[in-house]
Amino acid sequence: MRIALCSYSQKEKETALLMKLGKVDRFDNGVFCTYAMQRDGPYDAVVVMEDGARGMNFCMSIRGYSRDVPLLWISDQAEFEPQSRRMQADTFLVM
C-alpha cells in the first residue's frame, strides 16, 4: 500500500501509525503531493493531517489533480466539515 501523508507539522505518533500500514511519503503541502502523483503514479490513499484553511488548501490541490484517490482529512476543527464535503474528501475526522 502506498500512502501520501500531507502535513506541515510533524506529528510523530500519527506518522508512525500510518507507516505501519505500508509505504508512506510525507509532503509539506498538497502541491508537492500532486507533483509526486504526476511523476510516480497515484497513491492508494492520501491523508491530510492539517487544520483549517491549510488543510482545505491541501485537499484542493489533491482534488485538483485527482478525483479518484481516496482522501482522508484529519482536523481538530469540526467547523471545516462542510468544506470537506465541498472538497469531496472521502472521510473527515475530528481529533
Q: At which residue positions do the language-model features occur?
A:
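Hydrophobic/aromatic residues located in beta-strands of well-ordered beta-sheets
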Residues: 3, 71-72
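Two-component/phosphorelay signaling modules centered on CheY-like receiver
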Residues: 5-32
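Short, charged/polar "capping" segments at the starts of alpha-helices
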Residues: 10-16, 53-55, 79-83
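Short, structured coil segments at secondary-structure junctions
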Residues: 20, 67, 87-88
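Conserved phosphotransfer microenvironments
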Residues: 33-34, 42-66, 77-78
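Two-component signal transduction core modules
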Residues: 46, 71, 92-94
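Alpha4 helix (beta4-alpha4-beta5 surface) of REC/receiver domains from two-component response regulators
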Residues: 57, 76-93
